[in-house]
């Protein structure tokens, strides 16, 4: 009887209408037990649904708490089919030996394109003119309508999205400056500035592209808004906690800022049927969108394929490359032999105990990979065919002090049968 679980026995649960590309990739790689639901699940229903599930895929609404993770008796990996992973308690997942994967760059182009579109819309005052036309008005005027060419775009956070945005903006003739906490290689003629205040005071439009951290909470408040040029615009397509929306509403209502575009909010509806409330509602110079910056068909297709591939690679060969909460190991499959993975607390002596267990059974180690972080160690162990010693060795590895979990990925002469 093989030690590893065959792929047709591995259960995959995908929530929140994960893209078809993920389902296709799982099925093309031999995973036939794939269930996909359109909705997010609350904690109690999620616990029930996770019984017997090996891999879980979610987007942004399903919340994976420590309580849920500890109740998932068979869960080996989580895929966040999104850029962020705020919906998962990452430390809790690591403590129970569950790596979490995401797609940090797959929607970069989509967010950058939306930002460019919003810059043009704000500078031309298209939104209020469109509303007026729908209401029967005819506001044909050049007053307050400006070209973007020659204007200064200030980018806060010069990462993947910020740098992509700078390329698009420069192609349209904009001058681009950026502020980042770390040194970044600049693209084209983009110029870094030393402080956030300098960027705010110099920009005709400011676009925010920073992560959600304690340092970025309300980083744009009343003081920072006063630092911005009179008549400037603000765009936030990053995280909802970055801007004090009450302060922004005041700056817009007073006329200090000419306009704003906001795609993310501190509190967002849990579903498309829930009511959305914001202090920015009713302001004609504000473009409000329902967190759709990365929601294009192309981005969702890329995200589906990228996250599914990472889950498959972990299940098939033990690769944790791209996991956000786990030691990073990337390695190919071997055509023969047996591959074990051993997740343990990062304490002295575990690797010695693992090797001693293998030696006691007279099994030869062909290759061994170890990576650690401050809390967790991850060993991938490649051995000769273990034969009848496999079950006993597996039991001994589970008995190693500090062990979190042990699995066999493939065994005997059946490579990657899982």
Question: Can you describe what each PLM-predicted range is?
Answer:
Residues 61, 204, 209-212, 238-239, ...:
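Short glycine-/small-residue-rich Rossmann-like dinucleotide-binding loops
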Residues 321-418:
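A conserved regulatory-domain signal marking ACT and ACT-like small-molecule sensing domains
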């Amino acid at each position: 009887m093989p030690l590893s679980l065959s792929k047709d026995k591995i259960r995959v649960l995908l929530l929140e209408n994960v893209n078809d590309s993920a389902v296709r990739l799982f099925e093309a790689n031999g995973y036939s037990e794939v269930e996909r639901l359109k909705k997010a699940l609350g904690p109690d229903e999620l616990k029930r649904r996770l019984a017997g599930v090996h891999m879980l895929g979610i987007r942004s609404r399903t919340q994976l708490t420590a309580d849920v993770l500890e109740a998932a008796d068979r869960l080996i990996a989580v895929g966040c089919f999104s850029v962020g992973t705020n919906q998962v308690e990452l430390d809790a997942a690591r403590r129970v030996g569950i790596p979490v994967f995401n797609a940090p760059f797959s929607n970069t182009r989509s967010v950058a394109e939306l930002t460019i579109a919003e810059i043009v819309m704000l500078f031309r005052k298209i939104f209020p003119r469109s509303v007026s036309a729908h209401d029967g008005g005819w506001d044909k005027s050049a007053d307050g309508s400006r070209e973007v060419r020659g204007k200064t775009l200030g980018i806060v956070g010069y990462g993947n999205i910020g740098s992509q945005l700078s390329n698009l903006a420069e192609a349209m003739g904009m001058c681009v400056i950026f502020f980042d906490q770390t040194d970044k290689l600049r693209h084209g003629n983009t110029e870094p500035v030393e402080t956030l205040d300098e960027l705010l005071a110099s920009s005709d439009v400011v676009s925010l592209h920073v992560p959600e951290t304690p340092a970025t909470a309300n980083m744009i408040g009343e003081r920072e808004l006063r630092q911005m040029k009179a008549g400037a615009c603000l765009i936030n397509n990053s995280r909802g906690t970055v801007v004090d929306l009450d302060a922004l509403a005041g700056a817009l209502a007073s006329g200090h800022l000419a306009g704003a575009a906001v795609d993310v909010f501190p509190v967002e509806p849990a579903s498309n049927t829930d009511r959305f409330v914001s202090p920015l509602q009713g302001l004609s110079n504000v473009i409000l969108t329902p967190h759709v910056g990365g929601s294009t068909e192309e981005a969702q297709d890329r995200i589906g394929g990228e996250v599914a591939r990472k889950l498959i690679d972990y299940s098939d060969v033990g690769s944790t490359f791209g996991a956000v909460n786990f030691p990073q190991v990337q390695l190919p499959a071997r055509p023969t032999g047996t591959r074990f993975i051993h997740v343990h607390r990062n304490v002295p002596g575990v690797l010695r105990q693992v090797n001693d267990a293998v030696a006691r059974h007279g099994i030869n180690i062909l290759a061994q990979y170890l990576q650690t972080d401050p809390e967790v160690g991850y060993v991938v162990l490649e051995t000769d065919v273990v034969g009848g010693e496999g079950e006993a060795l597996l039991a001994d590895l589970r008995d190693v002090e500090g062990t979190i979990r042990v699995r066999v990925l493939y065994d005997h002469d059946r490579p990657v049968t899982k």
